[in-house]
């Protein structure tokens, strides 16, 4: 790992770290204000595919988080960038609330499959349609491959198991655009004009948030909220730079030890 430099940016996960669905993590709003009062740039990075960036921003504002749209980098944005780069016509296996992120994208006569978290669409008929497109040579683009995520009623299957099922059935490999992919973190940091060695990632997912960030040279802080389960910090190597109770505790550490 490259030598550490002065801290310039903090990347923060959203669901599970700042909030869990429509409930804020206790103390998160005030902690974010304290972090913003420093010289570091704060950006929000999320694999959320259940809703558009606009809807996500409205949810955060209702929870009294002071966040602007241009501060949020989502895996939906990364997926659209790849679709445009490859000039494909995707079959969109995404939640209907996420469709505004793909406005203007040609989907007639699809020659690619894009899959995110879409519980209402993960049924045999649509998955079989995707399967047949892939057999005909269509590329598979996974917005992310999270195993599960946190809801108010408990943990729930993420898109990862469904992506893996299509990979297995068609003997193909998905192109993944969200966390923990290196390109996702690098794109988020590019906007902040920041090198990985000048940044910290805070999240509740040991693999997608912490391991992904640390693989490009960032420091990773794992919080014990959201999808965190006991001993998650032991599942990755190297382990997280820090494991703490919640986002406010992570901010306390940054203010006391990294600035």
Swiss-Prot record:
Q: Which residues carry this modification: N6-succinyllysine?
A: 50
What domain of life is recorded for the organism? Answer: Eukaryota
MF term (GO), any? enzyme binding
Query: Is the keyword Disulfide bond in the record?
Result: no
Give me the residues that bind substrate, please.
13-15, 46-47, 179
Show the coiled coil region(s). Answer: 47-72
Record text on cofactor binding: Binds 1 Mg(2+) ion per subunit.
Q: Which InterPro entries match?
A: HAD-like_sf (IPR036412), HAD-SF_hydro_IIA (IPR006357), HAD_sf (IPR023214), LHPP/HDHD2 (IPR006355)
Give the family, as the similarity comment puts it: Belongs to the HAD-like hydrolase superfamily.
Its recorded name reads Haloacid dehalogenase-like hydrolase domain-containing protein 2
Native species: Mus musculus (Mouse)
Highest classification ranks of the organism: Eukaryota, Metazoa, Chordata, Craniata, Vertebrata
């Amino acid at each position: 790992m490259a030598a550490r430099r002065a801290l310039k940016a903090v990347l923060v996960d959203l669901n599970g770290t700042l909030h869990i669905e429509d409930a804020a993590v206790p103390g998160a709003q005030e902690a974010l204000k304290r972090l913003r009062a420093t010289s570091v740039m704060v950006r929000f990075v999320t694999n959320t595919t259940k809703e558009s960036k606009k809807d996500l921003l409205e949810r955060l504002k209702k929870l009294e988080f002071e966040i602007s749209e241009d501060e949020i980098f989502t895996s939906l944005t990364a997926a659209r960038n790849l679709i445009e780069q490859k000039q494909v016509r995707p079959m969109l296996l995404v939640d209907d609330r996420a469709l505004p992120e793909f406005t203007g994208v040609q989907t007639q006569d699809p020659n690619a499959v894009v899959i995110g978290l879409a519980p209402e669409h993960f049924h045999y008929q649509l998955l079989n349609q995707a399967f047949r497109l892939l057999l005909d040579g269509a590329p598979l683009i996974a917005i992310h491959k999270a195993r599960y995520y946190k809801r108010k009623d408990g943990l729930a299957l993420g898109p990862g198991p469904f992506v893996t099922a299509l990979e297995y059935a068609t003997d193909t490999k998905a192109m993944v655009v969200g966390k923990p992919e290196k390109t996702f973190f690098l794109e988020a940091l590019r906007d902040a004009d920041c090198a990985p060695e000048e940044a910290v990632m805070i999240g509740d997912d040991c693999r997608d948030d912490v391991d992904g960030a640390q693989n490009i040279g960032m420091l990773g802080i794992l919080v014990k909220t959201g999808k965190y389960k006991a001993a998650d910090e032991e599942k990755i190597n190297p382990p997280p730079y820090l494991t703490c109770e919640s986002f406010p505790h992570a901010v306390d550490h940054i203010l006391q030890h990294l600035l």
